[in-house]
Design a protein with these regions (language model features):
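Membrane-interface helix-boundary motifs at transmembrane edges
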Residues: 87-91, 128-129, 160-168
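Alpha-helical transmembrane segments of multipass membrane proteins
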Residues: 46, 174, 178-182, 186
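Perimembrane helix-loop-helix junctions
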Residues: 150-177
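Short acidic/glycine- and proline-prone juxtamembrane loop motifs at membrane-interface regions
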Residues: 107-115
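TM-lumen/periplasm interface segments of multi-pass membrane proteins
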Residues: 1-87
Length: 187
């Protein structure tokens, strides 16, 4: 296996993607959350992405590598789309997201970009006062990674400062409902 030696750490090329493919039994046609002892520790939408890509790759000698490559392709596409969203939000800063060393270095470590893209869409729509779209996107983002839950605080403060209390309650309600929609069936 390409990631089975200590070299993955020495050469700074660790990735959860191939590691968890075998460790979480995705290579055995198992649903990400079916094991009571070895389930995926990621939130439900990330686990679904992991499971889906494990299903679409051809089985055979290079399964793990194929799994990694399919994920690489989609993560690269997400990275480019995130740069486009940043361009739509603030054109003068778009190049910064596209060449950010931390983003590039961590591009293929795990599936975080699936959460980042929905979080960026949430910011984009919030900025345009499309609160329903924004709340749906942040609910999806939280179902993909728990970090985006912290975006709710500044959103709540902005709506509170604008005295849009009903909109704040509606926003939080849509976010929670979206989160529950994806998570309750897996609980």
């Amino acid at each position: 296996s390409l990631w089975a030696t200590p070299d993955q750490y020495v050469h700074a090329c660790y990735s959860d993607i191939p590691s968890l493919y075998g460790e979480r039994e995705l290579d055995d046609d198992r649903w990400s959350y079916s094991s009571t002892t070895n389930a995926v520790e990621y939130p439900v939408l990330t686990g679904t992405v992991m499971w889906f890509f494990a299903r679409v790759i051809p089985s055979g000698e290079n399964e793990m590598l194929n799994y990694y490559r399919v994920n690489q392709i989609f993560l690269a596409g997400l990275f480019l789309f995130i740069a486009f969203i940043v361009y739509r939000i603030r054109p003068e800063f778009a190049y910064l997201s596209a060449i950010a060393p931390a983003a590039i270095a961590s591009l293929y470590i795990n599936w975080d970009l699936w959460a980042i893209i929905s979080m960026m869409l949430s910011i984009y729509w919030f900025d345009r006062k499309k609160y329903t779209h924004s709340a749906l996107a942040i609910g999806i983002s939280i179902s993909t990674k728990f970090l985006p839950i912290f975006l709710l605080l500044p959103i709540a403060l902005i709506l509170w400062r604008r005295n849009e209390i009903k909109e704040l309650a509606r926003y939080l309600g849509i976010t929670v409902a979206t989160f529950l929609l994806f998570n309750v069936p897996v609980m």
